[in-house]
């Protein structure tokens, strides 16, 4: 199940809220313009291509494109591999998103498989949204956040963009992300 955990931004040891209730998650996040919803899962091949993922969710993807005006959509597929380069690739992919940053674009992600955590630093709180298969999270442009896919990333996520440049982050040079439980720690605590 999806999990929302909230802490003061100065004290990762004090959990103010921890919930798996979808309605409570929706209500808390919508205060900040963040939307959370769920889609019915579809069958996918073991190692799907971006095209196979998008085709499986064509109706939902088209509806989001129509509603939000996105012009580019793709699917990120991360899965453990026997390739000797996999550990280095996984580490590099994870580290790319682990620091606080913002985007000039909304960040909409649907998890078709696996999980990841979006940490939203809003006001004086950190909201860790552990998204799992079936979750669609929409984070408004310019929201300070970071993302952790874990030390062994294993997910399929559909990504939506308003321009052809795709993902462009403006990093904030803070150490806030280092002070909060990681994806692996949140998963282990369940």
Curated annotation (Swiss-Prot):
InterPro entries found in the cross-reference section: ARD, ARD_bac, RmlC-like_jellyroll, RmlC_Cupin_sf
Pathway terms, separated by semicolons: Amino-acid biosynthesis; L-methionine biosynthesis via salvage pathway; L-methionine from S-methyl-5-thio-alpha-D-ribose 1-phosphate: step 5/6
Residues of the site described as Important to generate the dianion: 109
Reaction catalyzed: 1,2-dihydroxy-5-(methylsulfanyl)pent-1-en-3-one + O2 = 3-(methylsulfanyl)propanoate + CO + formate + 2 H(+); 1,2-dihydroxy-5-(methylsulfanyl)pent-1-en-3-one + O2 = 4-methylsulfanyl-2-oxobutanoate + formate + 2 H(+)
Positions annotated to bind Fe(2+): 101, 103, 107, 145
GO biological process, alphabetically ordered: L-methionine salvage from methylthioadenosine; L-methionine salvage from S-adenosylmethionine
Keywords of this entry: Amino-acid biosynthesis, Dioxygenase, Iron, Metal-binding, Methionine biosynthesis, Nickel, Oxidoreductase
Protein name: Acireductone dioxygenase
HAMAP family: Salvage_MtnD
Domain of life: Bacteria
Residues engaged in binding Ni(2+): 101, 103, 107, 145
Function in brief: Catalyzes 2 different reactions between oxygen and the acireductone 1,2-dihydroxy-3-keto-5-methylthiopentene (DHK-MTPene) depending upon the metal bound in the active site. Fe-containing acireductone dioxygenase (Fe-ARD) produces formate and 2-keto-4-methylthiobutyrate (KMTB), the alpha-ketoacid precursor of methionine in the methionine recycle pathway. Ni-containing acireductone dioxygenase (Ni-ARD) produces methylthiopropionate, carbon monoxide and formate, and does not lie on the methionine recycle pathway.
GO molecular function, one term: nickel cation binding
Site (described: May play a role in transmitting local conformational changes): 106
Essential cofactor(s): Fe(2+); Ni(2+)
EC id: 1.13.11.54, 1.13.11.53
Cofactor info, note text: Binds 1 Fe(2+) cation per monomer. Binds 1 nickel ion per monomer.
Enzymatic class: oxidoreductase
PANTHER family named among the record's database cross-references: ACIREDUCTONE DIOXYGENASE (PTHR23418:SF0)
Species for this entry: Saccharopolyspora erythraea (strain ATCC 11635 / DSM 40517 / JCM 4748 / NBRC 13426 / NCIMB 8594 / NRRL 2338)
């Amino acid at each position: 199940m999806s999990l929302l955990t909230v802490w003061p931004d100065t004290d990762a040891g004090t959990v103010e809220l921890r919930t798996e209730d979808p309605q409570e998650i929706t209500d808390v996040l919508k205060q900040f313009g963040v939307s959370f919803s769920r889609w019915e899962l579809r069958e996918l091949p073991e190692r799907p291509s971006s095209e196979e993922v998008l085709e499986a969710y064509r109706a939902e993807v088209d509806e989001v494109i129509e509603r939000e005006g996105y012009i580019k959509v793709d699917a990120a597929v991360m899965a453990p591999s026997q390739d000797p380069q996999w550990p280095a690739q996984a580490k590099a992919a994870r580290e790319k998103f682990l620091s606080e940053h913002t985007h000039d674009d909304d960040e909409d992600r649907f998890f078709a498989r696996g999980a990841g955590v979006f940490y939203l630093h809003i006001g004086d709180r950190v909201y860790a949204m552990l998204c799992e298969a079936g979750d669609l999270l929409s984070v408004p442009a310019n929201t300070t956040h970071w993302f952790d896919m874990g030390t062994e990333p294993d997910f399929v996520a559909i990504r939506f963009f308003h321009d052809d440049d795709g993902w462009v982050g403006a990093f904030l040079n803070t150490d806030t992300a280092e002070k909060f439980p990681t994806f692996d720690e949140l998963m282990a605590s369940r």
